[in-house]
UniProtKB/Swiss-Prot annotation:
Subcellular location: Cytoplasm
Alphabetical GO biological process terms: protoporphyrinogen IX biosynthetic process from glutamate
E.C. number: 4.1.1.37
Annotated pathway: Porphyrin-containing compound metabolism; protoporphyrin-IX biosynthesis; coproporphyrinogen-III from 5-aminolevulinate: step 4/4
InterPro entries in UniProt: UROD/MetE-like_sf, Uroporphyrinogen_deCO2ase_HemE, Uroporphyrinogen_deCOase
Family statement drawn from the similarity comment of this UniProt entry: Belongs to the uroporphyrinogen decarboxylase family.
Gene symbol of the encoding locus: hemE
Chain segments annotated as coiled-coil in the UniProt record: none
Keywords annotated in UniProt: Cytoplasm, Decarboxylase, Lyase, Porphyrin biosynthesis
Catalysed reactions, as listed in the record: uroporphyrinogen III + 4 H(+) = coproporphyrinogen III + 4 CO2
Name of the protein described by the UniProt record: Uroporphyrinogen decarboxylase
């Protein structure tokens, strides 16, 4: 039995006593205890692949702040890693793949990994975290979106131009669609396995959807997000596991995403929540969308911006605060002050009381 079900109620647009709050990258390098755990573990991957350490890191922010959810400590690139691309990290450069896929032959060789063998460490982490949370707050599981995973798989790492994947979109769209289809199959299986292991809400991160033109977004990202929303088995009625579709730069697509079949849409700070709520038209809950850079501001500035964000949502939602999960518009940065996170959480709780 969940002691705090605010997140699940808000994602299902049910009444809550205050707006729930959690933060993307709430378990991360801004916390000294995270840095100590990482130093002990040796690397990011050795933390993510050890269920007990992944659990320890997942719980760290909840031991400091009264957050309304835990999010699994993992990485969006676990799926391509399990497909054989071999993930590694370069200090200062981020994730890389030793075996990127750049032609039809390599793409056609890819298969959906087995979730309880190649990705068992993720499912074991979900199980351990659920046990340790002991019903205190819900656990969010997640995956990268098909488009975002394909970006990394083809580029071989992060990119500024996305030249390789965009060239494939123009020159061999059928090959790219084959890759996106395979990755979508894997994402659906991955999220279903996390749900079976105990995840109580699920989020898809379409981090790079915003680099596409509207026509390309509607061809190479949105249809695959919609397929996930339609095909991912999430249960029925009160037991249904809510699905959040988050994207950077997705504000112009809120109406499309609201029609996808997901329970909620997460937006970044480049659209006002008032505008996003009007576009959503009450069909989905909204999550977001404070600019993470606000945490560099003074405590007073943070409180002011939290109030503006809460009010913006209500303004676009007919005066009601229901159906909103407070979050940042993207993940936290390593140089942010943990005390400012405490200010943010306290402000959300105080200012959103019903």
């Amino acid at each position: 039995m969940l002691k705090n079900d605010r997140l699940l109620r808000a994602l299902n647009r049910q009444p809550v006593d205050r707006t729930p709050v959690w933060l993307m990258r709430q378990a991360g390098r801004y916390l000294p205890e995270y840095r100590a755990t990482r130093a002990r573990a040796g690397s990011f991957l050795s933390m993510a692949k050890n269920p007990d350490i992944a659990c320890e890191v997942t719980l760290q922010p909840l031991q400091r702040f009264p957050l309304d959810a835990a999010i699994l400590f993992s990485d969006i690139l676990t799926i391509p890693d399990a497909m054989g691309l071999e993930l590694y990290f370069v200090e200062g450069e981020g994730p890389k793949f030793r075996h990127p896929v750049r032609d039809a032959a390599a793409i056609h060789r890819l298969g959906v990994p087995d979730m309880e063998t190649e990705l068992r460490y993720v499912m074991d982490a979900v199980r351990v975290i659920r046990r340790e949370l002991d019903g205190s707050v819900p656990l969010i599981g997640f995956s990268g979106s098909p488009w975002t995973l394909a970006c990394y798989m083809i580029e071989g790492g992060g990119s500024k131009e996305y030249a390789r994947i965009k060239a494939m979109a123009f020159n061999a769209p059928e090959v790219l669609h084959h890759l996106l289809g395979t990755v979508t199959d894997a994402v659906i299986a991955y999220l279903a396995a996390q749900r079976a292991a105990g995840a109580q809400a699920l989020q898809v991160f379409d981090t790079w959807g915003g680099v596409l033109s509207p026509a390309m977004y509607h061809e190479f990202s949105l249809p695959y997000l919609t397929r996930i929303a339609h095909e991912l088995e999430r249960g029925e009625g009160a037991e249904r596991t809510p699905l959040v579709l988050f994207g950077k730069g997705n504000g112009v697509y809120v109406a499309d995403l609201a029609a996808s079949g997901a329970e909620a849409v997460g937006v970044d700070w480049t659209i006002s929540l008032a505008d996003a709520a009007q576009r959503a038209g009450g069909r989905v809950a909204l999550q977001g969308n404070l600019d993470p850079a606000t945490l560099y501001g003074s405590p007073e500035a943070i409180r002011t911006e939290v109030g503006k964000t809460l009010d913006s949502y209500a303004q676009g939602n007919g005066g009601s605060r229901e159906g909103h999960v407070f979050n940042l518009g993207h993940g936290m940065s390593p140089d942010m002050n943990p005390e400012h996170v405490g200010v943010l959480v306290e402000a959300v709780q105080r200012l959103s009381k019903r």
